[in-house]
Amino acid sequence: MARAAIERYASECDEYGNRLLREVIPSTMGEPLLYSKFNELLQVCEAKSLKLNLTTNGSFPGPWGSDSGMERLLGSCSDIKISTLSYETGGLPYSLWSENVERLMQCRNRAENVTGNGLSKVSLQVTLHGQNAANEMATVEWAKGIVRFAENLGIDRIKWNRVVFLEKNSPSLRERFGVDNRLFEMLRQEMQSGALRSSKVKYGGSLFFEQDAGLCSVGGKCDACPFENEVWVWPDGHEDHCPNPERRWGNSL
């Protein structure tokens, strides 16, 4: 179904003949590099001259952990976002995670010397939750470490995303991982003009959204939805134009 959807959208153009489909984003309901048909998806996109926008947990399993595998991803993606959750939750040792990020950047540096530009951007994706954003002082110091790591390697961007809960989530889960909005505001200020400001790494993510994606209307359209130009294609082929997790997995189903 993914092939049919990609081919259909890739054929649509605006009034000036420009293709409307800009990139393809593999689902992050699992590790994309472990999907049985990921290589097929990559081939379809390469044939259509489309870039992938990839989010990975940083494990780079199988052939994707080799230099040639990383180089192929760098040439086929518009952005490779590496999530920090994999080592925060114990799924991947930090030493292996950081080593893989360093190797990816080394591969990009070598490839840039040969091919020039046109290679993928590399980003870190950080989820802000109650276990890493417990109080102001500790959170700023923790975030400084991530920023320094990114700056030293030449990472292009850090996506800072707020934790999102479903309505049915238990109070204990919210108490453990929830974050006071005042701390989010403090982080924004520190990143824009304080101790976390960086001249080398760009910042993005839901921390900077005008409207919290977790609070948007489930039944309607948000006033300023950052995903309004995206189409979500499910395994059975049906399409969705709203990424709100409450709409898909909350009590509304």
Residue spans for each PLM region:
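Radical SAM enzyme [4Fe-4S]-AdoMet core and its adjacent flexible, acidic
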Residues: 1, 39, 48-51, 71-252
